[in-house]
Amino acid sequence: VMDDSDDRLAARLAPALALLAAVGETGHVTRAADLLGVPQPTASRRLAALAEVVGAPLVLPSGRGIRLTRTGRTLAAASTRALAAMTAAAREVREEIDPGSGRIVLGFLHLLGRTLVPSLIGGFRERNPGIRFSLAQGSRQDMLDALHEGEIDLVFVAPMPLGDPGLVSRPLADQELLLCAPPSHRLATRTRVRAADLEGEDLVTLEHGYGLRQITDDLCAAAGFEPRIAFEGQESETVRGLVAAGLGVALLPRSDHPPAGGVVEIPLSPPVFRTVGVSWPAGERLTPAARAFRDHVCSHPTDLGPAFRPPRGKRSGQA
């Protein structure tokens, strides 16, 4: 339980957060001073004064630089976290004043970067030219983890995290998944294939943590067999290339372009779709710029090509 002395100590430490964080980052008083734009003697005096306030040394000499003591490391780490929170707050305050000039950190799966992301961003930027985007790509699990940790504002993801109470999701489109096989494969001449036809086949798929991997595993389980995974990758184009080389078959979205000569795309029976959606943190945690983009995405149907259809998936959470 924090007592009054803790409050008083925290209040005296607060003005030195930037110095403590800079010393922790650089390991050198002079470099920390340069980073903050203050004279080195001033930084040294402030550190000495802080040590007196705390009652323990914060730094020790180490070669030509310094190293933090255990107490110093604790305070430097806390200072870094506190400054990150203040930076985020300053950004939000600035965007509250001028929502038209904010920055949106948008996460998405690799497979969605060709059509969905450019289409949705392009339409929004026409009406909001001052808003900037930082784009992050990764696996489904990586993107959802980053969303929970506040590293990104929104994520385009499939399948949607409908069971996560900390996130709100809205469907955008359903994307058909097809079996990709080399032309010489026994299934290549079929007009349709069933999931059960894949039993015993060498499958090329994405690693665990990717949405397509989960869909592949679930489809095989529903058909009553465990998939025989021959190769795992992190990029759909790598998976497609392995299929073209005759190393297995794969479940992938329809190609944006006519498939290359080394790959045949075969619809499944019944058809298999995955719902692509947008997810964001529950509650009022979005900046004005991110809220504007979310509203644009959720209210503007976009023609994304033959691989997509209007969504039939469910939504989750409260906006």
Predicted segments, located by residue:
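Short helix-boundary/capping micro-motifs
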Residues: 21-40, 55
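A short LG(V/I)-centered, amphipathic sequence patch enriched
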Residues: 51-70
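Beta-alpha-beta core module
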Residues: 164-171, 175, 237-283
